[in-house]
Amino acid sequence: MFEGLYGLSCVENQVLAFLRQQRVEVAPLYYNSAVPLKELFFFLVIQGIRPVYFDRVRRIQDDLRERGILAFEKRNEALSFWLDRADDGSGPEASLILVTPAFTAETLMARGFRGDHYVRLLRRNQDWVIQNDIPDREVVLPLEELEKAYAGSGFCIRLCREPDRDDVRFFWSSRTFKPENHTAFWFYEQDLDGVPDVGSRLRDMTGIYKQLRYRTAAYYETHGLNTTFIWKKGAEMERIYALAEYYNLKRSIPPSQFFSLLNEIARMDNALMSELRMKLGG
């Protein structure tokens, strides 16, 4: 359900999955994903901004709502409101509901980086179905368990129209981060001096980084570029992210190893973005 989708939050993943169900091509929506590594490092490591508050890339649902493509409204309602709206997932509307942290951890086995977690609510025959993004799974719940899991709010989503050529051109012209302007960036060991909780911050940065580079590859593919060279680095990006998570959990890592990991990311990213710049004529 969520394979090949690169949202930066559970809600964005759900929106992307809904759009794909509606046969909307989602890759053009990743237009502003080529955030330079130095900006990711500054905001997520130096400043310590949590991924949930990272706003250098605007959320896709906000872009689409502003363009009149998507109706997206948060509602604080009784569970009965969402039960009445639920369908089998084939229609032009969707309901996301907030679930409790206990349900998120114990039933969904999800480990998010924020306290609130949203899932899609579906009705299939007489069953209530919860659709989760990460891990990608569905859970069938009796009503009494759903009542315990529900945490009091949700989002109403409706596709108003499909993105058209004007939207695609608008997204291209609205890019803040243009790979054709890429300049190489390297780290210095003293960049980490005085940074608290380096392991957690570096884990957050690498998690956002890999998602954004996947999005970048998907976006520029829609503009006729061969971005296989980025996709081929997917396994390496996942390995670096796993290593950053290991360093975070171990909590006894010397600064030199964090610096080594940063340089590994920089070497890879400079090569990727330089090639993308060349393909774009920069």
Language-model features: where?
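Phosphate-binding glycine-rich loops and adjacent basic patches that engage nucleotide phosphates
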Residues: 20-28, 41-49, 174-180, 198-205, ...
